[in-house]
A protein has these predicted regions:
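Helix-loop-helix connectors at the membrane interface of multi-pass transporters/channels
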Residues: 1-10, 84-94, 115-135, 167-170, ...
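Membrane-interface "cap" regions at the ends of multi-pass membrane proteins
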Residues: 1-41, 45-50, 64-68, 80, ...
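Hydrophobic alpha-helical transmembrane segments
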Residues: 24, 52-57, 97, 132-137, ...
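Hydrophobic transmembrane alpha-helices that form the core helical bundles
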Residues: 42, 54-55, 63-147, 152, ...
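Inter-helical loop and helix-membrane interface segments of multi-pass membrane transporters/permeases
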Residues: 46, 115-143, 182-212, 279-283
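Transmembrane helix-loop junctions in multipass membrane proteins, especially transporters and channels
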Residues: 68-76, 128, 150-154, 176-187, ...
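TM-loop-TM module centered on a large, flexible mid-protein loop between adjacent transmembrane helices
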Residues: 85, 92, 124, 197-202, ...
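Membrane-interface loop-to-helix entry segments
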Residues: 132-193, 223-224, 247-255
């Protein structure tokens, strides 16, 4: 039975204040985080350098298909409900209802996880600090950034993402110099000595096909957040033009960042290194990024990466609060949630949905 489109009409109370640069950085910021900075070492350790690289490329290709499909729908029907609205309109209202509430719940819980992660990160500098106070502080920051306006959220996310992108570019640049022997830390045998790590032990495909499938979940987690473009399309300027452009740019940037970063790590650190298997936010010294920077002689590499990871956690929580708030607002507009959550203040912020999510 066809869905009643009147219930899925595009909300008009939100303001279209997100520019093209905001869209690109929102998606990049949602995808480059602890999955790359910390968990990437585990993928190399479990599947070998070749297996990890192949896993990121395969999942990246899947994300490309997802992004182009979502981008096409978002450009045609730019609403904050994104795929939940599309599901209700083109499949079934029950499908859209389930999709929307599951997505809201997913991000609402993820915000709590990010707050716990922030506690662990801050424990690096303040081991005796009160974790509850740190969580309350960061929750207040996330709430404030989302309560100002959508433009305020976009600007904050833009600079959060810029820090992470700069770190990845710097890491790749330093890593290439180490591989070429220009900067210390590479193989003493020279350039080809680094490539010998790909034939060490069971490399390049340690663990075979089962290991490749096993790390796919870690890789999939790393790409989580690219769908935020669909959510943000409902508040973007000229979505018919900016959304397709952002989708094309974001996919290639994210894929290249991940592929080159994994390649650099695998050419400088043996996949048998026990540090790679660790995946602990409470000990940033085991991050493959930290290990490479320390080998290059960068002083206080652990402290720098800890700050970057903190930025990643705040960025993820900030994006999650935005996405879940807009989803709850759209559900209310479609009469799939209490109508009180459809209230929008004069700055274009769905405050009741924001309070409920917080």
């Amino acid at each position: 039975m066809a869905a009643d489109n009147s219930k899925n009409a595009a909300p008009t109370a939100l303001r279209r204040e997100l520019k093209a640069r905001h869209l690109s950085m929102i998606a990049i910021g949602g995808s480059i985080g602890t999955g790359l900075f910390v968990a990437s070492g585990a993928t190399i350790s479990q599947a070998g350098p070749g297996g990890a690289l192949l896993a990121y490329m395969i999942v990246g290709l899947m994300v490309y298909f997802l992004m182009t499909s979502l981008g096409e729908m978002a450009a045609n029907l730019p609403v904050s409900g994104s795929f939940a609205t599309y599901g209700a309109r083109y499949v079934d209202e029950g499908f859209g209802f389930a999709l929307g509430w599951n997505y809201w719940y997913n991000w609402a819980v993820t915000i709590a996880v990010d707050l716990v992660a922030a506690q662990l990160v801050m424990a690096y500098w303040f081991p005796d600090g009160n974790g509850m106070l740190w969580s309350a502080l960061f929750l207040a920051i996330m709430f404030g950034l989302n309560a100002i306006s959508v433009k305020g959220f976009g600007e904050a996310e833009y600079w959060f993402a810029a820090i992470k992108v700069t770190t990845v570019i710097l890491f790749i640049g330093v890593g290439v110099l180490m591989i070429l022997g220009i900067v210390r830390g590479g193989a003493p045998e020279g350039v080809w000595g680094n490539f010998a790590l790909w034939s060490q032990g069971d490399a390049p495909f340690a663990g075979g096909f089962s290991a490749l499938i096993g790390v796919a979940m870690i890789v999939g987690f790393s790409f989580q957040g690219t769908e935020l473009i669909g959510i943000a399309a409902g508040e973007s300027e000229n979505p018919a033009k900016n959304v397709p452009r952002a989708v094309r740019q974001v996919f290639w940037r994210i894929l290249l960042f991940y592929v080159f970063a994994i390649l650099v790590i695998s050419l400088l650190i043996p996949y048998t290194d026990p540090h790679l298997l660790k995946n602990d936010l409470g000990d940033i010294s085991v991050s493959p990024f930290t290990l490479v920077f320390e080998r290059a002689g960068l002083l206080s590499a652990a402290a720098v990466m800890n700050a970057v990871v903190l930025t990643s956690v705040l960025s993820a929580g900030n994006s999650g609060m935005y996405a879940s708030t807009r989803m709850l607002y759209t559900l209310a507009c479609q009469r799939m949630a209490p109508r009180m959550f459809s209230y929008v203040n004069k700055r274009g912020v769905p405050t009741m949905a924001l309070l409920a999510t917080t």
